[in-house]
Amino acid sequence: MDAIEQLKQDVREGRIDVERLVDLVATLQRQLQTLQQQLRVANQHIEALQKQSGDGGQPKADQPYSLRAEENRQEARKKMKKRKPKPVRRGRLTSAAKIALAVRHEEVFPEGVAKQDCQPSHVRPVWRLEQGRAVVIAYHIYRGPNSRYGKIPGALGRSEFGIEIILEIAFLVYVIGLSFDKVSALLQFFQGLQLRKAQADALLYRLARHWENEFETLCTLLAHSAVVHADETGWSLKSVWAFVSEKARVLLFGVPKDAETLQALLDPATFAGIIISDDAAVYANFSAAQKCWAHLLRKAIKLTLQAPNDPDYRAFTDRLLEIYRSACRVQRDGRLSDAGRARQVAALDDELLELCAPVWVAELPKLTDETEDNYRLLVQEVMRLMLAKELFTFVTAAPTTQPNGVSQPVAGTNNEAERTLRGVAQARDTGRTNKTLAGARRQTIVVSVLESLRLYLPCFTLSSVVAEVERWLETGRSCYQKLLAKLKLSVAERPILDRVLPKPDS
């Protein structure tokens, strides 16, 4: 039984008097008045909101498909468009504004197609460097038969910047080590080119994608070089590994320092050249090696600094340096034949044996004094490298010739690779490094291709680099690919870059 039925029964049976019933009715009436007042306030609030929204209270047309209803809908759309704010431009010029800035207009036709057989297609403004200033040139692209379009000289795809500007940015960022902010400031101050950081970043990614095949060609040339300098250093992402030869300069950014990475570029089982490196274990399996004399001499000099009053350390260091200088003189002596140099190397081995024999023959255990133990380890290292014939390889090795015609003797130190990594180490110490794998891939490609041009050009300048790269764009073949074809070599089926630096997941 609900409350209403119970109340009726109580009234019929006389359990509820009349006064109590009147009080109950009055209470319900007051509650009803309160609710009605709240409803009126809510309706007034709704009407006010509809007036503020403008069209919120607009009555809907009785005939939705009539002419009057369509006019009402169009009028409502116009009001919405008027209220929509216009997008704010961020300083980028429109194509029409760039064309208005053009210093001249040039027509570009498809190669081998006459002008009368073509028709205008579109106009592309491109920023170029002329006489040290940034100017806009409007290229009128013509379309020929079979949808063949004219190709703008010195431009990558649909980029609005010439190749000379992209190469300048790459050199300033990766070779000189400037930030994007400083590069933008330099371009604006010296050449009058306003370039945002996002634009510079996008241009470098475009250049890296365009040069991926050139990087693979350089890796193949490196694997078939006569002499390779190898060195590595720490970085924000794992390590940086530099490989410098007479045919290529390859720098790998963000790779692990292990045998698998080294095998991807220089397989010890197949590499027939000489590798010049420090005494790291990862370089232990090559058939012909030259260990860096600078590392050994620095260790010996450190002993003399730790114990300046010890005559044995001083005598050992002086004698070791004298033997190295004697080896350099034997290498430069043009009067010696191959057999004569071999005899001189045997004599140098005897001198090293005489120098190290007292400590080496004693087979001393690990010593408690750190300096004395370092001296023991250095003597053992020198003897181990001498017995492995890895100290005087440079004396009997033939000089190497670079593609630009420069001939150089094989070095007894690894200073060439260390100098290549000097700027990278400074960038690491100051925090100016890539933090992503995509950035490491980009820097690997761009730096390797740019640095390798030093071996192919007689003079490494912006004008010479631009002229060479423009020739690549015109002929479709780089100087690296020409040398690869001359040597009758082919690149690996699986890209080496994807093996050492896999593409990040998109």
Report residues per predicted region.
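Short, flexible loop/hinge motifs at secondary-structure junctions
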Residues: 1-160, 230, 236, 277, ...
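Catalytic center-proximal scaffold of phosphoryl-transfer enzymes
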Residues: 12-14, 18, 33, 37-40, ...
